[in-house]
Design a protein with these regions (language model features):
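Glycine-rich beta-alpha junction loops
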Residues: 16, 30-36, 225-226, 288-290, ...
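N-terminal "arm"/small-domain region of PLP-dependent enzymes with the aminotransferase-like
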Residues: 1-60, 68
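Conserved N-terminal alpha-helix of the aminotransferase class I/II PLP-enzyme fold
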Residues: 38-90, 112-120
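PLP-dependent enzyme catalytic core of the Aspartate aminotransferase-like
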Residues: 118, 127-128, 142, 146-149, ...
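Conserved small-domain helix->loop->beta segment predominantly found in fold-type I
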Residues: 272-275, 279-281, 286, 290, ...
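Well-ordered beta-strand positions enriched in small/hydrophobic/aromatic, beta-favoring residues
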Residues: 151, 219-221, 318, 344, ...
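Conserved PLP-enzyme active-site core in the AAT-like
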Residues: 2, 8-17, 79-311
């Protein structure tokens, strides 16, 4: 949209802009291929001389309309959808890294992302230094290497709920001449825009709050357009030197601020796949329309539930950035003054055993791997999502053995609290 609107309006009106007589609702372009009148025109598409669609493995109109909406919400210049949040994080890093390169990553990122970067990408020859997000800038500077290509972290860590000091990590990245990549899944662009604090690339698992209904798996990457790749051309040859697979095109020369997303789309998506299905993109768009309303309820419910847990005699500890007693309260107020997220972590005095018993007695909340949708759900990360990590890695990631991850939904908050109360009473 040409005019700048509030996020609530963007969520409804941005993306698909129907012309006279066209459908009011975003269409699903359920087609693998697209027809052209001449061979020459299709050839221009393959040479990147003309924009358009020819195969859904690379691009699809439904996806692009939804990506444009997310891009506007984040304040970026270009965006793309992927098949999952994991794919988004992989593409975001691999788009600028290759064998022999190095990544700096916050230790408290989601377990699947931790494994992706420290184990899977290591097999590709990409090394990673895992850092304490609370370390001083001077300590963090010691991890910079000549082959460092990016710094990676999460706005709010899953499930440790560590609030990243985005400005500190942006300073670290930019002193190293590399971009800061931030996974903004838990905060969503409704509560935080990392670009305003120095981040360069933002990723999302759209599976979570953006979809909001646990119906689709997907991811997104948004480029701020602020990082000057050409100023550090020697670090980023994939963007700043000719690509032999496209007749020698140099992305930064041909596409300017759109270089990063263009390369990820036409090169990585072409070679690796991982496009989001158009029907999933359509359902994601439906979720985005109510994202501001849902985030308001998620956050208000979570605040009340966290306060209940903090005052319960059988609860050993509670971690929620909205509590004044929380270690990250001030950072949360700085970066997310309207609210952080709907996820709480806590532990019972009965420990790890009590956690399992409590979860087994829940009646309203469900035990599921998922997090951040409309329904209240719980998980024991040490037994589930982080099961592949060693005890040392769990401690490093901020995942205590007794940690229960509670994703507070948008049901009536009194019903949520009543369910937790009866289950906790039966946990001994």
């Amino acid at each position: 949209m040409s005019k700048k609107y509030a996020k609530e309006t963007v969520c409804i009106q941005s993306g698909w802009q129907p012309k006279n007589g066209e459908p009011r609702i975003l269409p699903i372009y359920q087609s693998t291929t697209f027809k052209y009148e001449t061979s020459e025109q299709m050839g221009r598409l393959f040479d990147l001389e003309e924009s358009g669609y020819f195969y859904t493995r690379l691009q699809n109109p439904t996806n692009d309309y939804v990506a444009a909406k997310i891009c506007e919400l984040e304040g970026g210049v270009a965006a793309m959808l992927t098949s999952s949040g994991q794919a988004a994080n992989y593409y975001a890093i691999f788009n600028i890294c290759e064998t022999g390169d190095h990544v700096i990553m916050s230790s408290t990122v989601y377990g699947g992302t931790h494994n992706l970067i420290t184990v899977t990408m290591k097999k590709m020859g990409i090394e990673c230094t895992v850092v304490d997000p609370d370390a001083s800038l001077d300590e963090l500077r010691k991890t910079i290497q000549p082959n460092t290509k990016c710094v990676f972290g999460e706005t709010i860590a899953n499930p440790a709920l560590v609030v990243l000091d985005i400005e500190k990590f942006a300073t670290l990245a930019h002193e190293a001449g590399v971009p800061l990549i931030i996974d903004n899944t838990f905060a969503t662009p409704i509560n935080c825009n990392p670009f305003e604090w120095g981040a360069d690339i933002v990723t999302h698992s759209t599976t979570k709050y953006m979809d909001g209904h646990a119906m689709t798996v997907g991811g997104a990457i948004v480029d701020s357009g602020n990082f000057d790749w050409t100023a550090h051309a020697e670090k980023f040859p994939g963007l700043c030197t000719p690509d032999a697979s496209y007749h020698g095109v140099t992305y930064t020369e041909k596409f300017g601020k759109g270089a990063y997303i263009t390369k990820a789309t036409v090169q990585l998506m072409r070679d690796l796949g991982s496009i989001q299905a158009p029907q999933n993109a359509f359902l994601l768009n439906v979720g985005l329309e109510t994202l501001p309303l849902r985030m308001e309820r998620h956050c208000s419910n979570a605040q009340k539930v966290a306060e209940f847990l903090e005052n319960h005699e059988k609860v050993a500890w509670v971690n929620y950035p909205g509590l004044p007693s929380n270690k990250y309260y001030n950072l949360a107020q700085k970066y997310m003054p309207k609210g952080s997220c709907g996820v709480i972590s806590f532990g019972l005095k009965s420990g790890r055993t009590g956690a399992g018993k409590m979860m087994d007695h829940l009646e309203l909340a469900a035990i599921v791997t998922h997090v951040a949708d409309a329904r209240t759900c719980v998980l024991h990360p040490a037994s589930h999502t982080h099961r592949q990590m060693t005890d040392e890695q769990l401690v490093e990631a901020g995942v205590a053995p007794d940690l229960i991850r509670l994703s507070v939904g948008i049901e009536n908050v009194d019903d949520i609290i009543a369910d937790l109360k009866q289950a906790i009473e039966k946990a001994d």
